[in-house]
Amino acid sequence: MDIKELLNKTDRFAANAGCKITEVDEHHAIAEMTVTSAHLNGGHVCQGGALFTLADLAIAALMNQHGELTFGISNNIMFVSSAKEGDLLKAEATFVADHHKIPSVEVNVTNKDNKLVCHVTGMGYRKSVKLPTE
């Protein structure tokens, strides 16, 4: 099972939030989510936690693709524009540095018009254990 299938099956939090990995290769990972009424905050725009969940799933796919368990240890999110109900969002994660122990990534979350919604940077820690397969 590849990382896309594995995380789409086992990351229940992301799945329950409507997030799904659509693409993973050596250099990037993409996750997508359509904003629903369940994602909206009191201002009637997509809640920041939903945006972070989408970005975090793309980060997880990129950092864990070689089967070595990697957890996030630091993340920063900058909100640039609002996402509204019905928007299809795409989070594309790329490596800044694919260090063997502490990789760092950046993620751009965009809407269907390729407008930047938020920018995320993150660092992970690769443990010396295999990624669980269930």
Label each residue range with its predicted role:
Residues M1-E134:
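Terminal targeting signals and extreme-terminal segments of soluble enzymes
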